[in-house]
Amino acid sequence: MNTFEMKTAIHFGADALGRLKEIPYKRVLVITDPFVVKSGMIDMITKPLQAGGKEFDIFCDVVPDAPVGKIAEGVKKFLQYQPEAIVAVGGGSAIDSSKAIREFALKINNYGKVGLVAIPTTSGTGSEVTSFAVVNDTEAHVKYPLISESLTLSLIHISEPTRPEPIS
C-alpha cells in the first residue's frame, strides 16, 4: 500500500491568484524580494487582496539564502504590523524567509496562529510544501536548518501556470 499525505492545500489553475481575495484573514503581510515589486508583479497579489477588502503591508527586502540580518528586519516588521497571515511571494528564499520570520516572531511574542500562504514564482525548492527552512549566518559562514511542523503551510499554496504568448 502507498500513501501520500500533505497538510498544504494546493490551489492552481486559471485565476488561482484571484482566490487571494477569499483567504480568511483581514490583515496580511506580503513578504517578497525587490524584483517582484519593481517589476510590477506585486500587482497580481495586491489587486486580489484589495478586491477582498484585505489590509496589507509589504516587506520586500528578501535576498537569496535568507541571511539572519534580513530575517531580523522581517521579524521587526511583523511585530510592528501584527498580521493575521503572511503571503510569501517568490522562490525558495522568499518562502524560507517568510517561514523563519513567522516562526521567530511567534516565539518572541507568543502571538498565536498566523496563516501562511505561498505563491511560488520558481520551481524546484519545494519550500512551499515542506516543514523546513534555511537561515544563513553570513558572518559565521553557517547555514542553519529550521525544522518544525509549524513551518508547513497549513492554508494554501497558489500556483498560476502560464504559457508563452505567441509573438506576432
What are these regions (language model features)?
Residues 20, 45, 98-101, 167:
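Hydrophobic packing residues within well-ordered alpha-helices of enzyme cores
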Residues 69-157:
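Glycine/threonine-rich beta-strand-loop-alpha-helix active-site module
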Residues 62-64, 122, 161:
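Short, solvent-exposed coil/turn elements at secondary-structure transition points
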Residues 156-168:
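Single conserved hydrophobic/aromatic residue that forms the stacking wall/gate
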Residues 34, 123, 163:
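Glycine-rich beta-alpha junction loops
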Residues 1-85:
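ATP/NTP phosphate-donor binding region
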Residues 39, 96, 126, 165-166:
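Conserved protein kinase catalytic core
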Residues 14, 141-142, 163:
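Glycine-rich, charged/polar anion/phosphate-binding loops
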